[in-house]
Design a protein with these regions (language model features):
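Extended, aromatic/histidine-rich regions of cofactor-dependent oxidoreductases associated
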Residues: 1-193
Length: 193
């Protein structure tokens, strides 16, 4: 897909003016900015960015033990399944004894989102979130949940998504030397008063 406008105006310089290549389902490493020409190849591109730079360990988890270099690598690929809480910032204050709406987004590399689970107790228990409309396999999928803090104090909120292929975000991030494809479950801490 070629993008030349955004929000009804020419694409801004920082976003790739005059034209940007958009590759749904793939990481931004493939979203070429300031596109001037297109060359169609029948083999993998052998330039620096494919052969040396944007590479991950060539195994099922795209990970290695911390500090260990991978034996073999491959180019970065499709998005991993990922989700975020977008309605509350880390450190937010919420009212004790009142329902707190929690919203966010989930997405992946094109399989589509099957389920989102929400935890208000640092991952000890998980509850199904309500999924918003499915706008297509490459779209963000909104989700909604709610929790009522029953006592004053700190709460660790977590969210994790599962896609239609059965892939679920890992509770702990997987490590690789470049930090690519990070999709561990994030935590948003809130205080109830």
């Amino acid at each position: 897909m070629l993008a030349y406008a955004m929000n009804g105006a020419d694409l801004p310089m920082l976003n790739g003016f005059p034209v940007r290549l958009v590759v749904p389902g793939y990481y931004g490493t493939y979203w070429v900015k300031h596109l001037a020409d297109i060359k169609v190849l029948d083999t993998e591109f052998d330039g620096f960015w494919m052969q040396k730079a944007y590479r991950i360990p060539d195994n099922d988890c795209a990970c290695t033990p911390v500090g260990k270099a991978p034996e073999k690598t491959r180019p970065i690929g499709r998005y991993n399944v990922r989700s975020f809480i977008t309605s509350l910032a880390d450190g937010a204050r919420v009212a004790r004894g009142r329902p707190v709406p929690v919203r966010g987004i989930a997405f992946d590399g094109g399989h589509g989102i099957r389920e989102v689970q929400f935890s208000a107790d640092d991952g000890k228990t998980w509850h199904a979130a309500r999924l918003g409309q499915d706008l297509g396999r490459y779209s963000f999928r909104e989700w909604h949940a709610e929790f009522t803090p029953d006592k004053a104090g700190a709460y660790a909120l977590k969210v994790r998504a599962t896609n239609m292929a059965g892939e679920t975000q890992p509770l702990d991030p997987l490590w690789n030397p470049s930090g690519y494809m990070r999709n561990g479950v994030e935590t948003v801490r809130v205080d109830a008063a």
